[in-house]
Amino acid sequence: MLSRRDWLLSAGAGFGGLALNALHAADNPLAAKKPHFAAKAKRVIFVFLEGGPSHLDTFDPKPALNKHAGKPIPDSFGSVILPMGESRSPLLASKRKWAKYGRSGLPVSDWLPHIAAHADDLAVIRSCVADGINHSAGVCQMNSGSILGGRPSLGAWVSYGLGTVNANLPAFVVMQDNQSSVVNGPRNWSAGFMPAVYQGTRIQGGAEPIPNLNTPEAVADAQQRGKLDLLTRFNRDFAAKHPAQTELDARLLSYELAFRMQAEAPEAVDLTKETEATKALYGMDAKETATMGRLCLLARRMVERGTRFVQIYHGAGSKWDAHSGIEKNHTELCKAMDKPVAGLLADLKARGLLDDTLVIWGGEFGRTPMSEKGDGRDHNPYGFSMWMAGGGVKGGQVIGATDEFGLRAVDAKLHVHDLHATVLWLLGLGHMDLVYRYKGRPERPTLNEGDPYTKIAG
C-alpha cells in the first residue's frame, strides 16, 4: 500500500504534474540551469545578524581604540554622518579579550570561542562598505543591492540564475530566530519585479514549519489533486489565449510546488531523525542556543536536499542594534549564535558539504568606535566586517582593513555590490551576465556595479 508521501509524489509525476510537465524545461523558470562558468559553490547559507553586530568587538581588534578611549575622534577624520548625530561622542573602548586561532593566527574575540575554532575556514572581510545608515535602507541593500525597495533579493537572483535541483522543495528558504518582525519584512526575500516563483519561502518554528502547507483534514489528497488539475486546465486554456501574460505559468508552478512539498517538506524539517550528538553539536541541548541551533540544523538539512539559498535571520527585529548597553546585548546574542553557527560549519565539513556550500556571516552594517548613550555604539556602514567560509573560499585569511579606530574601510574596500558579485561568482554566475528584462530594460543583480573579489578563492 502506498504511503501518503509516495502517493503525493506519484500524483505529482503523473497527470497531476500537468503544471510542471506542460512546461518544457526551457520554459520552466525553476528548472535546473548550468552556471555561466565553472562554479566553486553550489548553494548558500547566509546567517544575517539583523541590527548590525560590532566588528570592533568580534573580528577587527583596534588597540588604538582603547588607547584613546574617552577622547573624541581626531579632527583629521572629518565629519561623520550618523543616524543619531553623535559623531563627537567619546571613543568607546572594547572590553574584549583577543586571541589568534588556527594555523593562520586569525584574531577573534572571546565573544565567539566556538566560531574561532574554525578560523582556518574563515575569510574575514574587514573592509565591507554599504550606503544605508539606517536599518531599513541597510537591510534592504544587503539583501537586494539597493537601499530602495522593489528589487529582487540575492536569493531570488540565485534561484533565477540556477533554478532548483529538487522540484519538491523551495529553491530559496528564509528562517528567523524569534517572532519579531524583520525590518522590511518579506520585502527582504522578495522576487521584486521577477515572477513570485523566485521569492523566498518562510520556514518557522512550531507544529507547522511551512505556513499554510498542510491540507485541511476534511479535504482528501485525491480531492485536492483533482481541484489543482482542474484549476491548471482552466489556467492553461487562459494562457493559450493570452500568451503575453507569462506570470500565469509561474503561478501554476507555485501551486504545483506547494502540492509536491506536502510530500517531501515534512521529512526535510523533521529533526527527530537527527542523533542527540548532532543536536548537541548545534547547541540544541541548551536553552540559550536551542533556537538558533535548530535553525542552523534545518539549514543543513535543506541544502543537503537541494535547496539553493537559505537565509537565517538572527536577532530578528534589529536585536543586534546596541545603541546602549552593548556589553549585555552582544554577550547574550553572541552566546546564542556562536555555538550553532560553529556546529553548522563542523557538520557541513564532516559531511563533505562545506567544500561546495558557501556560508556567509554578517549584518547590514557594523558599529562605530564612538560611543552612544555612554555604553553603546551607533550604526557604521563605512567600514565593517563579514566573513565567508566554504564554497571555494580560501580560509584563514583577512581581506581589507579599516583605519586605526575602525571607522572607515581604507584598504580593499568591498561595497555591497562587490560582495554580491563575489557570491554570484563563486556560484558560477557573472553579475553582468545574469540579466532579467523588465519593461524592456536589462536588469542585473548589482545594478551594473561592483566586481567580484576573486582573490577570496583558494
Feature locations, PLM:
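Ligand-binding pockets and gating/stacking loops
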Residues: 1-458
